């Protein structure tokens, strides 16, 4: 992602969704270009705001843990081997052409799986992005509690029940209902996610720096 800014990531994601429709959720790592600035509390970045504006739930994986991004990392590895390392590219245009061919071939190989996936709605023709609009919808963060059962999230520390230490939690930030719900999460049984805690949460109303 060297050379990719939050603005260009936003534009590329929007271009992809215009072409292929809107997913129900989009999974990201915790890079500031996707999540927003880490040095300030209650920060929701450009890409997060785009997702919320279009009704897509952004999901941020557990920091510094492997496995959650395995599918995309595998895809990236194949692209590196099949496109980047295999050819000498005279210029950016050549690279983009070869990359587009690879992506198209990958979609053809996955056509059956894509056909089974839920249908993606198109972006509404009257949709207008407003990065200053009040935030609404859900943002999900996957996190791991520390030795005291605490979770660090959005620049705050939340105490989850003490019995759930060093364990995975799904933190569901409900910007519409103004609360955060914490659910236990087990890799062995991902369908079993009992509610551990609900806390009030309201995003401070500040101007987003565009």
Segments predicted by a language model, with ranges:
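Active-site beta-loop-alpha junctions of metal-dependent nucleic acid enzymes
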Residues: 1-25, 200-204
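Acidic/histidine-rich, metal-coordinating catalytic segments
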Residues: 4, 17-40, 62-64, 69, ...
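Short, glycine/acidic-rich beta->alpha junctions
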Residues: 5-9, 42-43, 163
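Mobile-element integrase/transposase regions
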Residues: 7-13, 19-20, 52-53, 139-150
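Short Gly/charged-rich anion-binding patches and loops
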Residues: 12, 45-46
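Short, well-ordered coil/turn segments that N-cap beta-strands
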Residues: 22-24, 56, 152
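Charged alpha-helix within mobile-element recombinases
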Residues: 40, 47-129, 134, 175
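C-terminal, beta-rich DNA-binding module of retroviral/retroelements integrases
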Residues: 103-210
């Amino acid at each position: 992602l060297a050379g990719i800014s939050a603005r260009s990531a936003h534009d590329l994601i929007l271009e992809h969704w215009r072409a292929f429709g809107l997913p129900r959720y989009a999974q990201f790592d915790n890079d500031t270009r996707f999540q927003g600035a880490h040095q300030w509390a209650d920060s929701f970045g450009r890409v997060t705001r785009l997702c919320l504006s279009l009704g897509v739930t952004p999901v941020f994986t557990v920091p510094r843990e492997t496995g959650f991004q395995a599918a995309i990392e595998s895809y990236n590895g194949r692209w590196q081997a099949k496109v980047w390392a295999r050819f000498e590219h005279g210029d950016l245009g050549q690279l983009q052409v070869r990359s587009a061919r690879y992506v198209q071939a990958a979609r053809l190989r996955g056509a059956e799986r894509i056909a089974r996936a839920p249908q993606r709605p198109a972006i509404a023709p009257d949709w207008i992005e407003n990065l200053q609009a009040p935030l609404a919808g859900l943002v999900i963060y996957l996190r791991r509690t520390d030795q005291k059962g605490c979770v660090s999230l959005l620049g705050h520390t939340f105490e989850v029940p003490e019995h759930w230490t060093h364990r995975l939690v799904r933190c569901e930030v409900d910007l519409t209902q103004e609360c955060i719900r914490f659910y236990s999460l087990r890799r062995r049984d991902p369908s079993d996610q009992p509610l551990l805690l609900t806390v009030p949460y309201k995003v401070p109303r500040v101007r987003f720096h565009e």
